[in-house]
Amino acid sequence: MIQTRLKGMGVALITPFKEDDSVDYDALLRLVDYQLQNGTDFLCVLGTTAETPTLTKEEKDKIKRLIIERVNGRIPILLGVSSNCTRAVVETLKNDDMTGVDAVLVAVPYYNKPSQEGIYQHYKAIAEATDLPVVLYNVPGRTGVNMTAETTLRLARDFKNIIAIKEASGNITQMDDIIKNKPANFDVISGDDGITFPLITLGAVGVISVIGNAFPREFSRMTRLALQGDFANALTIHHKFTELFSLLFVDGNPAGVKAMLNVMGLIENKLRLPLVPTRITTFEKMRAILNELKIKC
């Protein structure tokens, strides 16, 4: 299989809900169109930002199918298939219809806190179970365990279909170590909007973005400029969004970006429990910043 290269700005797509708690599939397709029309380079479907743990198997299958049909090959689809049970991920890869999926995203197992050898064996089993490109996802703030640079590089060297890592450890030194020592066919992708610009200057190839749900045109332009070496103009855009970066996660993800999308009139401000909407004080701060940026409110 030809190796997919996920470069530029990917968006970790949210799942819009109606007031009755059902999935708003019409709003979902509008959001996909919004991304396609505004420079998004690839979509990350059914990741953390999609509130995937709260979705049923039927809902996940329908969301995947609708998005793949709407995108119709125009940009790559990165599908989240994470679980803290290795066997469950392997069975998903073997049994689910992966037509239209370009690569899969798999987080380090959460809650059961495996050792570095356990993490390696988890990804080894997954890489050997599929011909699809696999993207590692290191997010210790959610999983409770950090995948070290040594483990990441071991996986990158041992398996040709492990093509990238979404790095959200917040440890720039660790990320730089991976970038400096990685094989040529392995990429580092930022998992944090706020460090996308500095990480690209070190050699990362892009971001899987949360804020890109709301601002795909602006943030994809920043990413593209940085990748082209136009750091001055990229930095100007980066600084434009600094306050919003910090507000995104004050009340948890995707509460922040859903509030932004609601202010912009694109979705209902609805999450599924145990997640709840952002506080009114945060909401009003976002509204004020969006007005200042002359974003439609």
Swiss-Prot record:
It is found in: Cytoplasm. This is 4-hydroxy-tetrahydrodipicolinate synthase. The lineage of its organism: Bacteria, Pseudomonadati, Bacteroidota, Bacteroidia, Bacteroidales. One of its GO terms (molecular function) is 4-hydroxy-tetrahydrodipicolinate synthase activity. Its EC number is 4.3.3.7. PROSITE patterns: DHDPS_2. One of its GO terms (cellular component) is cytosol. The record marks 48, 111 as: Part of a proton relay during catalysis. It comes from Phocaeicola vulgatus (strain ATCC 8482 / DSM 1447 / JCM 5826 / CCUG 4940 / NBRC 14291 / NCTC 11154) (Bacteroides vulgatus). NCBIfam families: dapA. Keywords: Amino-acid biosynthesis, Cytoplasm, Diaminopimelate biosynthesis, Lyase, Lysine biosynthesis, Schiff base. Belongs to the DapA family. It comes from the Bacteria. Its main location: cytoplasm. Homotetramer; dimer of dimers. GO terms for biological process: diaminopimelate biosynthetic process; lysine biosynthetic process via diaminopimelate. Pathway: Amino-acid biosynthesis; L-lysine biosynthesis via DAP pathway; (S)-tetrahydrodipicolinate from L-aspartate: step 3/4. It holds the Pfam family DHDPS. Pyruvate binds at residues 49, 208.
